[in-house]
């Protein structure tokens, strides 16, 4: 389970320079269930990319705190979180259409109505569609670590991207990351700690225990059985 959604090379204004993406477009074959979900539930829960900023109150039909998840994979944990918090709104971005189809099918089956999904490049969505100071939470769980040194530049968590996320969070909003790759966790911590405007919510100024709000995935359970660690980082926008 590797969810990877943007190209982290930017100019001084935070705009993408070259389309070196942190994901590989492995669309794969849609199952009949995924195809059915895309055909039938996308018109209700799907959001097309637009050059114009989105109005969340219009999109969800109400005013409520908005959580954005970048790279939701097959959507199991995103649907679980949305179902557990009906008083909040959730927007998920995933570039792989089978995952989007699976998420739509699961949301429909669970009767989740406070979830919208996109199938697009996340950095473009952040730049073009997400208003500044609008998000209560941004979630990035298990992005591709690109562990080979020559691929490190493909990692989604870089200073310009973290600064972009900061601009989209409300004051008091939180950027929550999780990874099972220790070197990437250290990289995330270094990047986030270098940015003025974020406060690490860890009492030890590094990692936080997994919050109850983040479901344990099957991928994570398998990792625990194999002795793999998982690192959660939570940074609040304080200025």
Curated annotation (Swiss-Prot):
Q: Which residue intervals make up region (Interaction with RNA)?
A: 150-155
Is this entry keyworded Methyltransferase?
A: yes
Q: What reactions does this protein catalyze? A: guanosine(46) in tRNA + S-adenosyl-L-methionine = N(7)-methylguanosine(46) in tRNA + S-adenosyl-L-homocysteine
Annotated keywords: Methyltransferase, S-adenosyl-L-methionine, Transferase, tRNA processing
Domain of life, per UniProt, equals Bacteria
A single GO cellular-component term from the record reads: tRNA methyltransferase complex
| Chain positions recorded as substrate binding sites | 148, 180, 217-220
* Alphabetical list of Pfam families matching this protein: Methyltransf_4 (PF02390)
Quote the catalytic residue positions: 144
Q: What does the record give as EC number?
A: 2.1.1.33
The pathway this protein participates in, as annotated, is: tRNA modification; N(7)-methylguanine-tRNA biosynthesis
State the Gene Ontology terms under molecular function: tRNA (guanine(46)-N7)-methyltransferase activity
Q: What does this protein do?
A: Catalyzes the formation of N(7)-methylguanine at position 46 (m7G46) in tRNA.
The similarity comment for this entry is: Belongs to the class I-like SAM-binding methyltransferase superfamily. TrmB family.
Subunit structure, as described in the record: Monomer.
Instruction: Write down the PANTHER family for this protein, in alphabetical order.
Output: 3-DEOXY-D-MANNO-OCTULOSONIC-ACID TRANSFERASE/TRNA GUANINE-N 7 - -METHYLTRANSFERASE (PTHR23417), PENTACOTRIPEPTIDE-REPEAT REGION OF PRORP DOMAIN-CONTAINING PROTEIN (PTHR23417:SF14)
Q: What is this protein called?
A: tRNA (guanine-N(7)-)-methyltransferase
Q: Specify the species.
A: Salmonella arizonae (strain ATCC BAA-731 / CDC346-86 / RSK2980)
